[in-house]
């Protein structure tokens, strides 16, 4: 009599158990046609997949970005000027920090 190792039986057993669990959860509920309960709600509302993140959104085609005042026209010169301003500001901050550090070191 040959013994089957337990490590070969367990994966097959788990596969069978989980396949039966998934089948039982996928079965549809049979309901009374006169009952307008919550089980039939999905069929009345239609497909609700990926609707929540679209609520309250407008189409981008409806928005004219060029006419909106809140969007400044961005070109290379404007972006370069902004980056130079940010760089100067960062250099000023670092310079102030170093000056404070040197003052504290001398005291």
From Swiss-Prot:
GO MF annotation list: hormone activity
InterPro entries: Bombesin
Similarity section: Belongs to the bombesin/neuromedin-B/ranatensin family.
Keyword Disulfide bond: no
Role summary: Stimulates smooth muscle contraction. Role in induction of hypothermia, stimulation of DNA replication and release of many gastrointestinal hormones. Possesses insulin-releasing activity.
Secreted listed as a keyword: yes
Keywords from the named record: Amidation, Amphibian defense peptide, Cleavage on pair of basic residues, Pyrrolidone carboxylic acid, Secreted, Signal
Subcellular location: Secreted
Pyrrolidone carboxylic acid, modified sites: 42
One Pfam family in the UniProt entry: Bombesin
Main location, first listed in the record: secreted
Residues annotated as signal peptide: 1-26
One GO process term, biological-process aspect: regulation of insulin secretion
Tissues where this protein is expressed: Expressed by the skin glands.
Propiece residue ranges: 27-41, 56-107
Name of protein: Bombesin
Entry-annotated residues carrying Methionine amide: 55
